[in-house]
Amino acid sequence: MKLNKVVIVSKFGSKISENAAKQVAKKLLSKKINVYTIAPVEVDNAKQVESLDKLNKIKLDLAITLGGDGTTLRAFRNLRSETPILTINVGGNRGILSEITLDDIDYAISSIIKNKIWLDKRTRVVASCNGKEFAPALNEIYVNRKNLTKTAEFEIKFQSDTVKQKMD
């Protein structure tokens, strides 16, 4: 995989994650890779942006998340659907979605550059209600209703199939 543009996403409010993001950014910059960081992470020669949504029009070769599942899901929701994400558990609680630890980053970057990897493609789930589309989800969507006195009617579409049914 040719790495030209990579964004590094750290866990909000975690100094451990922010410091790890700086380390990873420096490693990538030393390999002449263009790096984007998300504020407050700032690294010389990297391009800092205020938020992930500022990058959704840029074709990124890779996103690296440093945090827990929440950090990974935030990147997943805000980046283009074809952007691969390497997830590193740094300061996260469980890290169910994490692929590696920080100790493995050199090997992971080297493997990516040498194209000795496989991509696990995930389907995004998208929900809409009354014409308003919500951010994509990775594996589930929680539906709740305001008025509990009536049975709600749901319409679920998957590819060319549609199911419309009253459910509670």
Please give the residue ranges for each predicted region:
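ATP/NTP phosphate-donor binding region
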Residues: 1-62, 78, 101-118, 128-135
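A residue-level signal for conserved active-site and pocket-lining positions in enzyme catalytic cores
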Residues: 11, 64, 89, 141
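Short glycine-rich anion-binding loops that position phosphate/pyrophosphate groups of nucleotides
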Residues: 13, 68-71, 91
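Glycine-rich nucleotide phosphate-binding loop and flanking beta-alpha elements
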Residues: 43-44, 70-72, 149, 162
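Gly/Ser-rich helix-loop-strand patches that form or flank binding pockets
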Residues: 74-90
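Catalytic core of DAGKc-family lipid kinases
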Residues: 91-168
